């Protein structure tokens, strides 16, 4: 089949339909079409190979065409072509015009004339000469016209497109795995499918021509050999063909008879042929359905048709054997002959051998297919070293013995032979031979057969690669089996056996064969299994000689049957058809394949375009019976003789062509149709249809394989998913099992532990019980011993007791006498000590009374002096008032103001007298304590309670006298030199003498308003806000410098409070003058106390010196300035002595002070500070202004001008809602009480009270709804001798928290820093405690004024008047202090924060 495909694909298939109409179907288009179907990955790597393969295909096609047409055209006369020389040009003008020529048309329309002989010669010298170096070929010895050809890679690609070796192997395995029904469906021949294949191929051929014509000129010249056009006999037909092809290049269809009608004619002709010769084609296809034909295909169709026909062939052989057997049995029964016992045994053994031969014959085809598979797999696995089998047809003069040897040796390796030898009972045959004395010689033969069986066993078990050495043993074995075959075919076999001839022949052959086989250990013959061949010609010659040797004609069929039966023992059905010789060639070219093509019984010429020396051999198809085979042999010989005769005639006609050229032209046209054999035409048609059938089968096989592959992949995916799911379930199950095992293990461990615990408990109990019993036993013994000892001791004790009683009685009497004496002595001593203590206490009490009386006398004296001064001042004020009234400028305003002041004073007195909250507010339990200690860690002192109206009226007279005397006496400065002893003024501790029931003005000695120390302001002298008198020690105050500042209505509640607080006028580090401490003198004011807070406070960020206090304002520039009466005459240097630059005055003369509240107008006006006037004019950097307004008055002509910096209260005290000094002190005391209440109730936040909560409580207690937050903060910022107010700011400069504490209270922890260490301004902590510790030591030695009791660390207050409760008990004891202790004395040592509000 491969041979037919090779011839059909590589040759131009020609059909002649009528006169001068030739068409051909070239395989070049199909080749190119198939080459385009190769995948891109393979086409890139094999591009050059495809060009070589297409060139090979063209050479093969033209050579085959030349061989077939030259033989036919030598017998006919052809006309010379008449081509117009006007339109033609010659490429080679020197060359002669060829007599045997082919006229073609190039894609560009040029006419090409080629010589057939040149083509033939050129094709024999083709580019495939490189294969001569790599392959060896042996010349044929029978016929020059029968050559063996190989299918190269181009044919391989044309048939199977892009199928690689792996794909071919997979398709082959897929074909073998199909069942018979599926295979029948795939190879089923359908007319529509075949005709569709023809039409598609024709269209593809035309498209290929069009694409090749559009390509470039070099490609056109190369492709003109690929696309073969129909040849024409005349010049006119050639010209028409030129024009038609030019038209065909532009369009796919043409109406001319050469192009347009060609496709339809071909299709109609093919369809007609298919309808008329369908059965013939089917028969032909069935004829070529043989294993060797299909094996010649490139691997994929291996075993395809053979497996379909295998069962039919087996049945056919069995039927033939039955017919032969019946015929032989009938012939023997017709002419019976007496047979001896030996002949019967021989016949019986022959029958057994024949039956075994049938089974061997049935299995040979399968074995051959298996060997072919092995050879193909070996060739695929080793592409560089292919062991290729060339089946060579032996010539008539060849060595028949060598062919028979190869055949018989190959049969020796047959597994069926091995099975037959294994099934033979040689021992039993030996016994039977021994029993017959005539067959004693057969015993040796059977022994040799036993050795042969062992050898065959070794051969089948040996390695196949090592059996190539066995070729040298072919001759010996061939001799043995050839003799055996001759004996089996002979008619006188019983006589030969009886005479011992069989013994000699078999023993010689077996002995030589066994010796050669044993020398190689049985490993030298298996290599021949890969080179199994069939030797049909040799066996046919043997059969012919056997038939000729048989003279009786009636025994002809019997002898033929016997020869076939005997031959079937060693030869299968394929050996009847072929006679081959085995040649192994090592080929280095991996793409060079050697295939053995089979010729049909009809002779034909087929020449390949290779320079290889391939041997073509005849292939005789399978016959229905032996008579058909003999007839075929006779026909074959006749065909060969006819072929030789025809070849000789062709040579003679070639010689005559040169002489009678004109005659040939005239006679050739009429003899063309008659010369083409109808049989050859049908043969070509068969081949053409066979190619389409193969392509159809290939397409079906690939589609089935793809479908099967898709199903397998789908199934594999499903299996993988199921496997994955199962694995997942197994993992989960495994996890569950592991968990269960772990639980079980844990449970067992717990059980073991529990059992161990119980066991230990039982052991412990047993031990305890044993110990208890032992203890009880010991106790019983001890008890017994103790009882005995007790009885002895009791007796002894009784004796001792009696003796002891006697001694004790004597001793008691002695002790009683001694005690009496000691009691009397102690009583006398105690009485003496009591008397001495009483005397000491009496002396101390007398001393205290004397000191108190002395102090009282001094205080009375001072009060009288003060009262005198106040009266004088009052007279001056009264005179000034009368003078002011005479001016009639502000009569109505003064009356209204006096009335308002009186009303406010009465309201305030009534509110203080009638407010029970001051006495009974928030009385905590005795065990309550503050939850949050204060930041300063100072002892909590009792708050100042509001005095009743009655108490104020009782003491007003005394206070009035003290005011008068106070104006006359110089006030003691709070700032003293280091050498001076602290001597505070009496008025600095007076709280009960600040109210006057008969006067409408405030006292000028407000102790709470002296010493203004606002936040972190520099140390200044004490200032009386009401009268402005501030005597200053010059030698101390001159050393204190302070840059005067001008603050105008600074308030944290305004929208620009942050800007105001950070303005240049108030920033301590931005202003030109920074306050510094220049001396280390201890001061008696608040400014002297320096406190460095080391405790945690959430408001430490506000102590940054860059952040100015919004409420911090400089004190009054004139320390003696009075907001009500601004005309006070101090010295020229009074302003400078207080550390503040004094304003420039117009006169240096002093004048008397004007004590009038309204002030008297002096002729010489000087600038005075005004509470409501903020415009100041100062030559020292301060602004001094002329006083104007209601409260501005000039004290005298020569009164010095004072620099005025507005205090915190000055911006808020207006005529609409004024705040008096009494209100300021009351607000400060109430604020302290509210702070203590919040502290005791645990409502403080980090030791400080929220501002709004404290403000609301103060406003509620004082019943002052009109009190604003600015007024409250200004009251807190005014310096006080009793309290210290510390304001806490947020990041925006707003006050959020307030801390209140007593002033002048000794610190407990940490100790105060030394007075001579200057604190770093960047590390100043809470401003209100900045000067709290410097004067603590000086305050300890300060004198206590009248009306106060300095009990321990508690400062003097409003309600601890010395005149109340024997002069030693305050009117209301301080917070947390009791008037008496357990012994009845005053509790003078209990002070500090954390005390209860009231006792």
Curated annotation (Swiss-Prot):
Region (Disordered) residue spans: 28-105, 119-155, 202-249, 318-353, 546-574, 589-681, 722-894, 949-990, 1134-1178, 1373-1399
Biased segments, Basic residues type: 70-82, 591-618
Residue ranges that the Swiss-Prot or TrEMBL entry lists as coiled coil: 708-896
Keywords in alphabetical order: Coiled coil, Cytoplasm, Stress response
Acidic residues bias spans: 622-678
Function: May act as a negative regulator of salt tolerance.
Bias (Low complexity): 53-69, 207-249, 1134-1156
Protein name: Stress response protein NST1
Lineage: Eukaryota, Fungi, Dikarya, Ascomycota, Saccharomycotina
Cellular component aspect of the GO annotation: cytoplasm
Localization per Swiss-Prot or TrEMBL: Cytoplasm
Taxonomic source organism: Candida albicans (strain SC5314 / ATCC MYA-2876) (Yeast)
Main location: cytoplasm
Biased composition (Polar residues): 28-52, 140-154, 331-340, 547-566, 1157-1172, 1377-1390
Family: Belongs to the NST1 family.
Basic and acidic residues composition-biased segments: 341-353, 722-743, 752-888
InterPro entries: NST1 (IPR025279)
């Amino acid at each position: 089949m491969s041979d037919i495909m090779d011839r059909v694909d590589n040759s131009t298939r020609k059909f002649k339909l009528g006169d001068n109409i030739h068409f051909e179907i070239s395989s070049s288009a199909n080749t190119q079409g198939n080459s385009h179907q190769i995948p891109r990955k393979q086409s890139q790597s094999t591009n050059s190979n495809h060009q070589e393969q297409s060139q090979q295909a063209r050479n093969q096609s033209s050579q085959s065409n030349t061989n077939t047409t030259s033989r036919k055209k030598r017998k006919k006369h052809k006309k010379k072509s008449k081509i117009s020389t006007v339109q033609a040009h010659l490429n080679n003008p020197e060359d002669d015009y060829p007599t045997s020529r082919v006229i073609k048309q190039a894609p560009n329309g040029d006419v090409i004339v080629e010589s057939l002989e040149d083509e033939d010669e050129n094709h024999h010298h083709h580019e495939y000469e490189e294969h001569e170096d790599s392959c060896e070929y042996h010349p044929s010895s029978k016929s020059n016209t029968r050559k063996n050809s190989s299918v190269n890679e181009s044919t391989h690609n044309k048939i199977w497109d892009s199928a690689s070796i792996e794909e071919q192997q997979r398709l082959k395995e897929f074909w073998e795995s199909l069942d018979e029904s599926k295979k029948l469906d795939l190879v089923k021949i359908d007319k529509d499918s075949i005709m569709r294949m023809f039409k598609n191929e024709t269209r593809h051929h035309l498209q290929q021509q069009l694409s090749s014509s559009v390509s470039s000129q070099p490609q056109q010249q190369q492709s003109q050999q690929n696309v073969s056009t129909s040849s024409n006999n005349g010049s006119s037909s050639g010209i028409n063909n030129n024009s038609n092809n030019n038209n065909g290049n532009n369009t796919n269809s043409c109406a001319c008879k050469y192009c347009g009608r060609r496709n339809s004619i071909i299709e109609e002709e093919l369809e007609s042929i298919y309808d008329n010769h369908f059965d013939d084609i089917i028969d032909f296809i069935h004829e070529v359905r043989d294993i060797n034909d299909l094996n010649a295909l490139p691997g994929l169709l291996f075993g395809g048709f053979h497996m379909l026909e295998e069962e039919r062939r087996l049945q056919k052989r069995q039927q033939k054997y039955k017919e032969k057997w019946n015929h032989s049995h009938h012939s023997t029964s017709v002419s019976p002959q007496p047979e001896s016992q030996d002949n019967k045994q021989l016949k019986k053994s022959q029958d057994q051998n024949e039956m075994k031969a049938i089974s061997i014959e049935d299995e040979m085809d399968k074995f051959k297919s298996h060997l072919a598979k092995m050879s193909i797999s070996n060739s695929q696995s080793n592409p560089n070293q292919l062991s290729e089998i060339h089946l060579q047809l032996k010539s008539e003069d060849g060595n028949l013995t060598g062919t028979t040897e190869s055949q018989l040796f190959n049969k020796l390796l047959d597994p069926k032979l091995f099975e037959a030898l294994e099934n033979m009972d040689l021992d039993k045959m030996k016994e039977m031979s021994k029993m017959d004395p005539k067959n004693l010689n057969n015993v040796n033969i059977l022994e040799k057969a036993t050795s042969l069986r062992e050898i065959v066993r070794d051969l089948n078990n040996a390695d196949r690669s090592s059996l190539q050495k066995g070729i040298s043993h072919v001759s010996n074995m061939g001799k043995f089996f050839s003799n055996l075959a001759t004996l089996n075919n002979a008619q006188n076999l019983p006589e030969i056996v009886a005479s011992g001839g069989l013994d000699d022949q078999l023993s010689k052959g077996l002995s030589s064969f066994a010796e050669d086989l044993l020398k190689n250990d049985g490993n030298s013959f298996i290599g021949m299994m890969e080179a199994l061949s069939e030797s049909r010609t040799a066996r046919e010659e043997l059969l012919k000689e056997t038939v000729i040797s048989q003279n009786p004609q009636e025994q002809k069929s019997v002898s033929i049957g016997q020869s076939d039966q005997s031959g079937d023992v060693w030869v299968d059905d394929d050996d009847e058809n072929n006679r081959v010789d085995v040649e192994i060639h090592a080929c280095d070219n991996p793409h060079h394949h050697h295939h053995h093509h089979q010729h049909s019984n009809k002779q034909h010429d087929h020449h390949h375009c290779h320079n290889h020396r391939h041997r073509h051999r005849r292939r005789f198809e399978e016959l229905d019976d032996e008579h058909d085979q003999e007839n075929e042999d006779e026909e074959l010989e006749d065909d060969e003789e006819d072929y030789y005769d025809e070849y000789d005639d062709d040579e003679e006609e070639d010689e005559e062509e040169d002489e009678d050229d004109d005659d040939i032209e005239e006679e050739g046209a009429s003899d063309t149709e008659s010369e083409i054999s109808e049989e050859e035409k049908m043969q070509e048609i068969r081949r053409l249809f066979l190619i389409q059938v193969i392509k159809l089968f290939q397409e079906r096989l690939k589609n089935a394989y793809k479908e099967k592959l898709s199903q397998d992949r789908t199934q594999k995916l499903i299996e993988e998913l199921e496997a994955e799911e199962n694995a997942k379930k197994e993992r989960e199950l495994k996890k569950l099992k592991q968990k269960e095992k772990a639980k079980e293990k844990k449970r067992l461990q717990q059980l073991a532990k529990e059992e161990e615990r119980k066991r230990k408990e039982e052991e412990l109990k047993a031990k305890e019980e044993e110990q208890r019993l032992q203890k009880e036993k010991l106790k019983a013994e001890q008890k017994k011993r103790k009882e005995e000892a007790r009885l002895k001791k009791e007796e002894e004790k009784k004796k001792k007791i009696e003796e002891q009683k006697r001694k004790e009685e004597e001793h008691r009497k002695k002790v009683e006498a001694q005690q009496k004496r000691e009691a009397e002595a102690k009583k006398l001593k105690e009485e003496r000590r009591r008397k001495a203590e009483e005397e000491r206490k009496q002396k101390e009490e007398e001393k205290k009374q004397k000191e108190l009386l002395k102090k009282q006398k001094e205080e009375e004296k001072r009060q009288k002096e003060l009262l005198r001064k106040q009266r004088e001042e009052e007279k001056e004020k009264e005179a000034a008032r009368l003078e002011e009234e005479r001016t009639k400028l502000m009569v109505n305003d003064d009356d209204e103001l006096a009335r308002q002041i009186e009303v406010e004073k009465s309201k305030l007195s009534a509110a203080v007298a009638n407010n029970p909250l001051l006495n009974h507010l928030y009385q905590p339990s005795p065990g309550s304590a503050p939850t949050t200690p204060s930041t300063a860690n100072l002892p909590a002192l009792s708050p100042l309670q509001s005095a009743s109206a009655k108490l104020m009226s009782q003491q007003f007279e005394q206070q009035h006298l003290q005011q008068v005397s106070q104006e006359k006496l110089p006030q003691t400065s709070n700032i003293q030199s280091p050498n001076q002893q602290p001597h505070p003024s009496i008025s600095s501790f007076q709280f009960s003498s600040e109210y006057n029931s008969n006067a409408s003005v405030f006292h000028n000695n407000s102790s709470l308003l002296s010493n203004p120390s606002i936040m972190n302001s520099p140390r200044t002298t004490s200032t009386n806000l009401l009268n402005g008198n501030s005597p200053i020690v010059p030698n101390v105050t001159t050393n204190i410098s302070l840059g005067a500042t001008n603050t105008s209505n600074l308030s944290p509640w305004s929208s620009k409070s942050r800007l105001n607080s950070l303005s240049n006028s108030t920033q301590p580090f931005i202003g030109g003058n920074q306050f510094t401490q220049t001396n280390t003198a201890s001061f008696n004011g608040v400014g002297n106390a320096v406190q460095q807070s080391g405790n945690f406070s959430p408001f430490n960020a506000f102590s940054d010196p860059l952040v100015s206090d919004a409420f911090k304002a400089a004190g009054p520039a004139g320390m003696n300035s009075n907001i009500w009466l601004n005309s006070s005459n101090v010295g020229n240097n009074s302003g400078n002595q207080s550390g503040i630059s004094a304003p420039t005055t117009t006169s240096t003369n002093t004048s008397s002070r004007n004590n009038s509240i309204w002030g008297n107008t002096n002729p010489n006006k000087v600038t005075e500070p005004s509470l409501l006037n903020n415009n100041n004019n100062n030559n020292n950097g301060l602004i001094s202004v002329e006083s104007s307004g209601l409260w501005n008055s000039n004290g005298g002509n020569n009164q010095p001008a004072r620099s005025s910096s507005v205090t915190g209260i000055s911006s808020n005290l207006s005529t609409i809602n004024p705040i008096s000094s009494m209100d300021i002190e009351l607000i400060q005391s109430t604020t302290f009480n509210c702070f203590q209440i919040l502290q005791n109730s645990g409502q403080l936040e980090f030791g400080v009270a929220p501002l709004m909560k404290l403000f609301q409580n103060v406003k509620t207690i004082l019943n002052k709804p009109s009190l604003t937050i600015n007024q409250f903060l200004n009251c807190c910022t005014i310096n006080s001798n009793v309290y210290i107010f510390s304001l806490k700011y947020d990041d925006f400069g707003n006050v959020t928290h307030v801390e209140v504490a007593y002033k002048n209270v000794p610190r407990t922890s940490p100790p105060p820093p030394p007075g001579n260490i200057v604190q770093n301004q960047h590390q100043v902590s809470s401003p209100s405690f900045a000067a709290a510790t410097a004067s603590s030591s000086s305050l300890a030695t300060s004198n206590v004024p009248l009306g106060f009791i300095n009990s321990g660390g508690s400062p003097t207050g409003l309600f601890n008047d010395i005149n109340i409760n024997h002069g030693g008990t305050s009117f209301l004891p301080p917070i947390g202090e009791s008037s008496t202790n357990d012994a009845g004395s005053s509790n003078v040592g209990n002070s500090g924060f954390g005390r209860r509000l009231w006792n």
